[in-house]
Amino acid sequence: MGEMCRKGYNRGEFYTSAAVDRPMDIIFIEELRAETWIGIYPREKAMAQTVEISLQIGVSTASAGASDDIRDTVDYAVVVERLRNDLAGSHFNLLEKLTEHIATYLLENFAAQWVRVSVAKLGMMPGVKRVGVIIERSV
């Protein structure tokens, strides 16, 4: 995992490096389906494809936990809507580029300090459920 956040899988705890002076909270979105134009082969460029995206967004949720106000946190409905709209009008040759694009978008637009982004193409090859890329980035 990345420097900014490591998960203790047996205990479900998150740890941070010395670069962050407090524990990091994570908002997650799993198995989001979105349409985008992706691929290098003519058959892939002929139509939009569905990709599956899972996100972990490292932000402090302390204010929202205290206030119970959506304005004090990342609104995941807004994340989903904006990502779907952005990706619907975009083309990427590689999953790596698409994944970087999403990570950068989250870091720049949602005050995230750390993100983990997983993007998969579905049913691309016989006998393979999905192929994909997972990255972690931080500010």
Name these PLM-found stretches:
Residues 5-139:
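N-terminal, polar/charged subdomain of small-to-medium soluble alpha/beta proteins
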